[in-house]
Amino acid sequence: KGYVPMESQYDNSVSHALEYYVADYALSTLAEELGKKEDAKLFRKRSMGYKNYFCKEFGTLRPITKEGRFYEPFDPKEGANFAPSPGFHEGNAWNYTYYVPHDVYGLARLMGGKKSFVDKLQSVFDEGNYDPANEPDIAYPYLFSRFKGEEWRTQKLVKELLAKHFTTKPDGIPGNDDTGTMSTWAIFSMMGLYPD
């Protein structure tokens, strides 16, 4: 089928699937380096399964039921601030929709192209749907840099996020450090670097 169906209301099916797709992409890259072209092709194709979850109505990823239909009723903001969310772990559709690091340009095409992608991504920040304490969306500020002429957005947002969410106080990082994830994000960002 190419997707993980939703078995129960709060089963994290979309979150799990997205991690599988990133792993499949990594396996395709490894297989290619090993000269296993058929395996590389298989894993690369599987890594594109995220497209099954894309819902044009909302412009986000959306859980799919066992029957192969989009989950209803659906609110892409449900699950904000770590509240339970259908299909997503510790987040919502906005925290996960852009979590396709291996196919950013493919996701942009699904969304209608560069302008639509950039506008929608900017709205994630403008409307308070970005969660700096949640790993799936911590790369979001850097996605603007993938598109020529939009790099300034990355520079502006990273500067603002560092000033707002990272301090020298005991609670100076958003959420918890999750084995160094948040502090590493801050250090890379302060240096003006971000691993791709």
Labelled PLM ranges:
Residues 1-196:
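Active-site core of glycosidic bond-cleaving carbohydrate-active enzymes
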